[in-house]
Design a protein with these regions (language model features):
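Conserved small/polar residues in nucleotide/adenosyl-binding loops
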Residues: 264-271
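Hydrophobic alpha-helical segments, chiefly the membrane-spanning helices
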Residues: 275-283
């Protein structure tokens, strides 16, 4: 974009692109040496670029701030994570549907207050979770619409005096359009809060399913069996087969709740960009 807008010479733009590609390969191969004295990833890459292409690397920072770059990177991460989660949810839904199809005529009790209430099929029970997971997918994918705006060009918070083309940059990076307000652009982390909220709701559904399976697997119910591959035994009671995976899924739900709430609180300050949002152990 900087070359297109004649902000920097074409030869320097080519050098920067080639240099960044070389750095990318070094990072992918684990050969890039990060140095703490250079403060962060941005300065590490910039210093390495100077080593590779010389003074042309000075143009790298033109019309750009860490503020707009960080939120852009964050949006990329959320996008990729959302698509990965969507793929996993699709596989889980297909697996549940396959199991439901085989159990259309399998009768089981439906419960209220953990007491037998009405007869249902096991398929009907499983399909309840399909509905939950479909809603989870929608929550994650709806957030992609909110993410699909590119913050680059907002700079520190008030834009830049360079004659940049934000629409061109947004399109090149796969965004639908540039963001509308530079202050909001660098302060916005709503998309992360929405992502964590969707993750917490999805985790809650997984916890419910895990708890159901723990109960159904118990001797009192004996509705389902787990493969020995995922069960653990006891050091003193040889008859024990413990559903550890389901228990771990249930237990980790609290982590998702905590991250969602703590990150929301971190963002509840006046309209500005600072490093506070990176605290609190939220990763």
């Amino acid at each position: 974009m900087l070359v297109k807008q004649k902000i920097i010479p074409k030869k320097d733009g080519i050098k920067i692109i080639n240099g960044l590609k070389k750095i990318e390969k070094e990072i992918d191969k684990g050969k890039f040496k990060f140095k703490e004295k250079f403060e962060d990833i941005h300065l590490n890459i910039e210093k390495r670029l100077f080593e590779i292409i010389g003074q042309s690397a000075g143009h790298l920072h033109t019309a750009r701030s860490r503020n707009d770059q960080v939120v852009t990177d964050f949006k990329f991460w959320i996008k990729n994570a959302t698509l990965d989660i969507n793929d996993v949810l699709n596989l889980l839904i297909k697996s549940i549907l396959k199991k439901a199809e085989k159990n259309i005529d399998t009768v089981m009790p439906g419960f209220t207050h953990l007491k037998n209430a009405q007869p249902i099929s096991f398929a009907h029970y499983l399909l309840a979770y399909v509905e939950m997971l479909i809603r989870d997918k929608k929550r994650f994918l709806n957030n992609l619409e909110l993410i699909d705006e590119c913050p680059l060009g907002s700079a520190a918070l008030a834009g830049t005096s360079y004659n940049i083309d934000r629409k061109f940059t947004a399109k090149k990076l796969g965004f639908k359009k540039p963001t509308g307000n530079s202050i909001d652009s660098v302060c916005d982390r709503d998309f992360a809060i929405d992502f964590l909220s969707a993750a917490a709701t999805c985790a809650m559904h997984m916890s419910r399913l895990a708890e159901d399976f723990i109960i159904f697997n118990s001797e009192a119910f004996s509705f389902i069996n787990f493969s020995d591959k995922v069960l653990t035994g006891s050091s003193i009671m040889p008859q024990k087969k413990n559903p550890d995976p389901a228990e771990l899924i249930r237990g980790k739900t609290a982590i998702n709740y905590g991250k969602s709430v703590s990150y929301t609180h971190l963002r509840a300050h006046e309209t500005r960009e600072d490093r506070g949002w990176r605290g609190g152990g939220v990763k």
